[in-house]
Amino acid sequence: ESLGTGVATHLSQNRNFAGIILETPFTSMIDAAKKFYPYIPVGLLLKDKFENKNKIKNVKSPILIMHGEKDQIVPFEMGQKMFEIANEPKYSYFTKYDNHMMEYDENLIKTLNSFLINLN
């Protein structure tokens, strides 16, 4: 979830995993930090910028991106952007009602099962 998606995206760039699931991913740490600290030069302060929007272009494994529109920590638009940039095969689970902590309801479980069943 969120910060873990930076690590997962980084590790997935040069490996052939059966599949990757990113829950509430962010495009970069700079983009995410600017939401809370718009007047601070966060790019100068961060050692690892977690440029996920660049790294996801190198991911060749099937990917499922999940994000809720009501997320108040990582903007929903970042999850959408990550999905747009991701290579095929790619799948999404976007909801109108979930916030940063997604509810593992019947719809989400069905999506996860479907994604996992279709992996090689």
Model region roles, listed by residue range:
Residues F36-L45, N113:
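Alpha/beta-hydrolase superfamily serine-hydrolase fold, recognizing
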Residues N58-K60, L64-D71:
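Short beta-strand/loop motif that positions the catalytic acidic residue
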Residues E103-N118:
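Post-His helix in hydrolase/transferase enzymes
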